[in-house]
Amino acid sequence: MYRDFQFYDSRIVDYTRIGETLTLFCVYGIHEKWRTCFYRVKYLVGEDFLVGSVISFFGYENPGSGYTLFFRNSSRTASVVTPEHWRRIQGWEG
């Protein structure tokens, strides 16, 4: 059974990709900062479109193969596929 989900961040202002780990630096409102980390990333499509005015990111769970998430902004869409769940961490420096 597939499970859809959706959650919001105002915008992704930066990201890092080290090996199989993708970390998104997000700003919600004026003062709230979040890091959203994805581990064991299999595929990342549209990497150039991650930073920008992201209005939401959403996706679905594939039993046995993991998660596919889509990041939508005003011009193009990026997506990431990972077999593991992600982690949201409040705050970041900078």
Task: State the predicted function of each range.
Residues 1-94:
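Surface-exposed, interaction-prone regions used to assemble/regulate multi-protein complexes
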